[in-house]
Amino acid sequence: MNPRQLEQMARQMQKEMMRIQEELANTTVEGTAGSYVTVTMNGHREIKSIKLAPEVVDPDDVETLQDLIVAAIADASKKAQELAEQRLGPLAGGMKLPGF
């Protein structure tokens, strides 16, 4: 493969990577902690919303609510990670990408 072909392939991969990054920014996943907390996050792991079931808001038990929020964020983050790996996997050739 000559240098010109390599450069063309690199540009094509970069263009595809940018397209996938934009797609990840516009794709959301939901993480949950039971039916009490739902966290919506995009493919870049940016939290877009947190929904709480009214019955979970108990001023006498704030710790449980905090634990549920953390669990829902962790669940959403895992799903966003899986989404990114799925979309970027073919470009990465099976390599683990840091930050994804």
Curated annotation (Swiss-Prot):
Which Gene Ontology CC terms are recorded?
bacterial nucleoid; cytosol
Spell out the Pfam families in the cross-references: YbaB_DNA_bd
Q: What is its main location?
A: cytoplasm
- Transmembrane residues, as ranges? none
> Where is it located?
Cytoplasm, Nucleoid
Please indicate if the UniProt record lists Repeat as a keyword: no
The record's family statement is: Belongs to the YbaB/EbfC family.
Protein's job: Binds to DNA and alters its conformation. May be involved in regulation of gene expression, nucleoid organization and DNA protection.
State the organism of origin.
Roseiflexus sp. (strain RS-1)
Keyword terms, alphabetized: Cytoplasm, DNA-binding
Q: Which GO terms describe its molecular function?
A: DNA binding
State the name under which the record lists this protein.
Nucleoid-associated protein RoseRS_1534
Question: What InterPro entries does the record tag this protein with?
Answer: YbaB-like_sf, YbaB/EbfC
Please verify whether the record's keywords include DNA damage.
no
How does this protein assemble? Answer: Homodimer.
